[in-house]
Regions:
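Bacterial Sec-dependent N-terminal signal peptides
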Residues: 1-28
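Extended repeat-based scaffolds of very large eukaryotic assembly and lipid-transport proteins
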Residues: 19-152, 191-241
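Alpha-solenoid HEAT/Armadillo-like helical repeat scaffolds in large eukaryotic proteins
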Residues: 138-142, 156, 168-176
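Core of folded catalytic or high-affinity ligand/protein-binding domains
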Residues: 148-159, 163-165
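Hydrophobic core positions within HEAT/HEAT-like alpha-solenoid repeats
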Residues: 154, 186-187
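Short amphipathic alpha-helical surface patches that serve as generic macromolecular interface elements
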Residues: 166, 183-186
């Protein structure tokens, strides 16, 4: 028993020491993390949808979803709001993510999660696919109004493989070049469509190679930015619709 307690104390000590060794991000880095993990909240039937979500409780499979009769009673725009602000599937990641130093100076290989320990169910992603044109139009409408692309919108764009929205996203990005995750969306679209010039590049190998992980990134600088924009524009022009 004493040996077990000693072992547990040693593990706890190592965990605390590991936490102490993490780099302490700057205020600018922390502010950017808040910026890039923020979801866009559509206004369509928002109070009604939020009231419905507030009454949900998870079932035995840790799924929090509206009963079919309630979901089917929603208009398309209300369903858009529901799906954009609520992930139905519980998918806890047991490994805590360490703080990221200089997050604002990186272009990441992957997007951050929109719903912490939850994610979209197959039914929810199917809604995006089945109503693709309407979903893209509503995303554009919302982004034009709010001047930002929430992480949930980015995830939906990648999920739908919405290549047709590339010119719009580029226009949004070029306004202030603040949201580097728009560049990540471009990378993910080129990857999903197996765009050969990108697959053959050194940046692809670094971002999505065997050693890549959730935090893999390249440095945000003018050269990398311009290369991504050039590649995604070439990809878009040659994309077979």
């Amino acid at each position: 028993m004493r040996m077990l307690m000693a072992g547990l104390l040693m593990m706890a000590s190592l965990f605390v020491n590991a936490q102490d060794e993490y780099p302490k991000p700057s205020k600018e880095s922390l502010d950017y993390n808040v910026y890039r993990t923020k979801v866009s909240v559509p206004p369509y039937g928002l109070a009604k949808v939020k009231a419905m979500i507030a009454k949900l409780t998870p079932n035995d499979e840790e799924i929090e979803k509206l009963p079919d009769n309630l979901y089917n009673s929603l208009s398309l725009r209300e369903k858009f709001t529901y799906n954009m602000i609520h992930g139905e599937i519980y998918s806890q990641n047991c490994d805590p993510m360490p703080p990221v130093e200089d997050e604002h100076k990186k272009i990441f290989a992957q997007l951050p999660g929109a719903f912490d320990e939850y994610s979209w169910s197959d039914k929810q992603t199917q809604f995006f696919d089945n109503n693709r044109d309407s979903v893209i139009a509503l995303i554009k409408e919302s982004v034009t109004r709010s001047k930002r692309v929430g992480v949930n919108y980015k995830e939906a764009i990648v999920s739908m493989n919405a290549v047709e929205i590339i010119p719009f996203l580029e226009e949004v990005y070029l306004r202030d070049k603040k949201d580097h995750d728009i560049l990540t969306v471009f990378l993910l679209l080129m990857k999903a469509n197996k765009y050969q010039p990108f697959l053959a590049s050194s940046s692809f190998k670094k971002l999505y190679g065997d050693d890549a992980n959730y935090g893999t990134h390249i440095v945000y600088n003018s050269a990398n930015e311009q290369l991504i924009l050039q590649r995604v524009n070439d990809f878009y022009k040659n994309y077979k619709r």
